[in-house]
């Protein structure tokens, strides 16, 4: 028996368009991003790959992407479950900063360490920063789990317990699962699924609004490594654009 998993990064956000580090800042989709989300749902419908349940973050750009995609796929009625564990990586003190200006200020090596390394987090955010999430009601119960900054290793550490406790049981029950989330939370899961090394994960870029489908065996490992995009040519072009952010 195989289990179908669909990964969908949110459509272009307002801060994607401005080339800003976003992280946990709760920005909305652009009109382009809304169109990308709708197209993602259309691709699922056209391919006949239709989810029965959705898992998403508590950030509006992912939640709204899920809603728009589901409506386009005529699956607006299925359950949607939200968890902070699917949030984007927290970019610490980089949140709100322009990527190009950060690259120019700190140089290529430091920029790429902060942006794409496995275990080097950016400097921590101050709790009273305008780009901090401390004190927001959606995070009231986190306590010591509330991050000041994260690297990809940290995202994996918070994501995988939810994967095992909530998503795997849905897959095991025979549901087709859609995860509508973020570039780095999805990179964290793909690293786990495909066994990508700590070094090679730096080269993985996930484009906005492009459904990526995995068929998993009974051990929840891919039957075909790296899955398949429902629109592979468009996904490849969009992933290249993600790689060039900051330039």
Swiss-Prot record:
Site feature location: Transition state stabilizer: 182
A Gene Ontology molecular function term of the record: phosphoglycerate mutase activity
Gene Ontology annotations of biological process type: gluconeogenesis; glycolytic process
Listed PROSITE patterns: PG_MUTASE
Enzyme Commission number(s): 5.4.2.11
Reaction(s) catalysed (UniProt annotation): (2R)-2-phosphoglycerate = (2R)-3-phosphoglycerate
Keyword entries, A-Z: Gluconeogenesis, Glycolysis, Isomerase
SMART domains with a match to the protein in the record: PGAM
UniProt enzyme class: isomerase
HAMAP family: PGAM_GpmA
Protein name per Swiss-Prot or TrEMBL: 2,3-bisphosphoglycerate-dependent phosphoglycerate mutase
Designated gene of the protein: gpmA
């Amino acid at each position: 028996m195989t289990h179908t998993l669909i990964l969908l990064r949110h459509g272009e956000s307002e801060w994607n368009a401005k080339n800003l580090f976003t992280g946990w800042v709760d920005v909305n989709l652009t009109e382009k991003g809304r169109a990308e989300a709708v197209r993602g749902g259309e691709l699922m419908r056209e391919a006949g790959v239709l989810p029965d349940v959705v898992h998403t973050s508590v950030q509006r750009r992912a939640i709204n992407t899920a809603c728009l995609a589901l409506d386009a796929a005529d699956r607006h009625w299925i359950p949607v479950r939200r968890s902070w564990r699917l949030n984007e990586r927290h970019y610490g003190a980089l949140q709100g900063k322009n990527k190009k200006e950060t690259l120019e200020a700190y140089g290529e090596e430091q920029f790429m360490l902060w942006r794409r390394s496995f275990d080097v987090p950016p400097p921590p955010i101050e709790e009273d920063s305008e780009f901090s999430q401390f004190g927001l009601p959606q995070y009231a119960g986190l306590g010591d789990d509330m991050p000041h900054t994260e690297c990809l290793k940290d995202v994996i550490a918070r994501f995988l317990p939810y994967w095992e406790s909530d998503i795997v049981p849905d897959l095991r029950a025979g549901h087709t699962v859609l995860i509508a989330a973020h570039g780095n939370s999805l990179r964290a899961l793909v690293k786990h699924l495909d066994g990508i090394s700590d070094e090679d994960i730096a080269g993985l870029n996930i484009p906005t609004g492009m459904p990526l489908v995995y068929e998993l065996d009974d051990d929840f490992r891919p039957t075909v490594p790296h899955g398949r995009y429902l629109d592979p040519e468009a996904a490849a072009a969009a992933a290249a654009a993600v790689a060039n952010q900051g330039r």
